[in-house]
């Protein structure tokens, strides 16, 4: 049995202007956490923008798909998880205790 290669989108671009999510009174985030979230959000928005440009034919080579030549055998049974669902379950468990 052969396993299919793992593919990832690699972003090769610049960071955009700052974006702030609305505050949630039940959660307190450190400035470092907010900066990390902002960086990831901005980088992903850039990937999506560049991918749309590339797909419309106006730009080429901005977004590349990375495919591992030899997949890591320890990731063979890896199953992605929905982080929102995990957070929701953890919050519900905390409220029960």
UniProtKB/Swiss-Prot annotation:
InterPro entries (alphabetical)? MCRIP
Give the UniProt record's GO annotations in the biological process aspect: regulation of epithelial to mesenchymal transition
An example Pfam family from this entry, by short name, is FAM195
Q: Give the domain of life.
A: Eukaryota
Sites of Phosphothreonine modification:
30
Q: Where in the cell is it found?
A: Nucleus; Cytoplasm, Stress granule
**Iron as a keyword?**
no
Region described as Disordered? 1-30, 77-97
Task: Cite a GO CC annotation.
Answer: nucleus
| In-chain residues carrying the UniProt-annotated modification Phosphotyrosine | 41
Enumerate the UniProt keywords alphabetically.
Cytoplasm, Nucleus, Phosphoprotein
Return the motif ranges for PXDLS motif: 80-84
Q: Give the family, as the similarity comment puts it.
A: Belongs to the MCRIP family.
Its biological purpose is as follows: The phosphorylation status of MCRIP1 functions as a molecular switch to regulate epithelial-mesenchymal transition. Unphosphorylated MCRIP1 binds to and inhibits the transcriptional corepressor CTBP(s). When phosphorylated by MAPK/ERK, MCRIP1 releases CTBP(s) resulting in transcriptional silencing of the E-cadherin gene and induction of epithelial-mesenchymal transition.
- Protein name per UniProt: Mapk-regulated corepressor-interacting protein 1
User: What gene does this protein come from?
Assistant: MCRIP1
